[in-house]
Amino acid sequence: GLFVRSYSIVPVVRVLYFLFALTMILKTLITFRFCHETKQGKIRRAETRGISVFHMLGEYRQLIPGMLKNRGVLKAVAVSVILYVTNMVSTNFFGLYVTQRLGLSENFLALFPILNAAVMLIFMIGLQHRINATKFRIPLWIGLALYVVAALVLIFSPADRLGFVLLYVFIAAMAAALVNPRKDVLLQLNITSQERARLNALIMASTVALSSPFGYLAGWLSSMDRRLPFVFTLLLFVTAMFVIGRIQEPQVEER
């Protein structure tokens, strides 16, 4: 926000893109230098040596029916889609809501992601290891309940009151620290290690495809009332709580 006011948005965005490109190059170099192929990856490379890419793509036809028959995977995908949609709505419409309806200055928009990241970091470092001893579903329920509370705080926030928006960001960050790691674990516990890479690719593609129509729906709701997209996310969080309630407590094998 400070740089935009001083130099305008175009040069600032150019610098951001340059920094992003630089960090991705560094990440790629570090990955190739210090990371190694997994055991299953080595097995898969040996199995597919000499096989064409088109033949390997055709093998997905055998994976899709198996994925659709696995209720655990379908429930995990449902939770993943719901959280993907709610994150998409929050990312795209939060700025519009707090500036156009709540009347906050655009200069505050840069503050909220910093606060969100700081709260998540403190929560994960200070409290996450203590929560890991509890049952798997309970932290997920608590996180989703916090998301519901955060949505209610934002929906009923009075205009020109920064404190309510900061409270929303704080609660949502705690919820994300509880939900996001366990959402990913939930997917991994329901797929076999032999097909993990291909199933993860299918699940990611399915998540993006299934969530795409909801972006249009959220935009339509926002055009009627800036609060409606967040009412929609509230309903999705309640739905996710119901889905989690239908999932059997995962059993993690100790080694």
What are these regions (language model features)?
Residues T28-E47, G245-R255:
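Helix-loop junctions on the cytosolic side of multi-pass membrane transporters
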Residues G1-R14, S211-P229:
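Transmembrane alpha-helix termini and helix-breaking/packing motifs in multi-pass membrane transporters
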Residues V4-R5, F123-F136, S222:
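Helix-to-loop junctions at the C-terminal end of transmembrane segments
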Residues N92-L109:
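Short amphipathic helix-loop junctions that connect adjacent transmembrane helices
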Residues L109-I131:
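Transmembrane alpha-helices of Major Facilitator/SLC transporters
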Residues I138-V153:
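Structural signature of the two symmetry-related core transmembrane helices
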Residues L178-I191:
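Intracellular juxtamembrane helix-capping segments at the cytosolic ends
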Residues H36-V77:
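Juxtamembrane intracellular "pre-TM" segments in multi-pass secondary transporters
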